[in-house]
C-alpha cells in the first residue's frame, strides 16, 4: 500500500508554502482583483463560462399603465350581504327589484362564483360570462356602466 504525503502536508511550516517569494501572494492583485473585477477584461473567459447572461439586457417589462387592474367581487358575496347593503342604503329597491352599483363598494368586476337567491340589477364596468348568465337566471339584469 502506497502512502504518499500530499504536497500541502510537506509544505506546512515553511514560510511561503510553495508560493515563491512572500511578496508574490500578497493582496488581491495576485488573483486578478476582488470579487467580479475584470469580468469584461481579464476574467472574460470565466464570465462566458460561468455567468453568460451577466452583461446585456434580457426580457421585457410591460409599462404599468397598460396593465388593467381588476378588483373583482363574487356573486356569493353580493348574495350573502344584500340585506346589509340594503340597510346601509348602498343597494336600493326600485320597482320591486334591488339595484346595486358595485363601484360604490370599490369593485369594478363581477365574477360568477356562487349564485343569487333574489332578482338583483347589478351595475358594474365588467362582468364575467358566468356572472351574466347567473344574474339573468335569477331574474336580474347585468348592466354595464
From Swiss-Prot:
Subunit record text: Part of the 50S ribosomal subunit.
GO MF, one example: structural constituent of ribosome
Database matches in Pfam families: Ribosomal_L27A (PF00828)
Any Gene Ontology biological process: translation
Record flagged with keyword ATP-binding: no
SUPFAM superfamilies attached to this UniProt entry: Ribosomal proteins L15p and L18e (SSF52080)
Compositionally biased intervals (Basic residues): 1-13, 22-33
Region annotation Disordered: where it falls in the sequence: 1-41
Family: Belongs to the universal ribosomal protein uL15 family.
Protein name stated in the entry: Large ribosomal subunit protein uL15
Alphabetized UniProt keyword annotations: Ribonucleoprotein, Ribosomal protein, RNA-binding, rRNA-binding
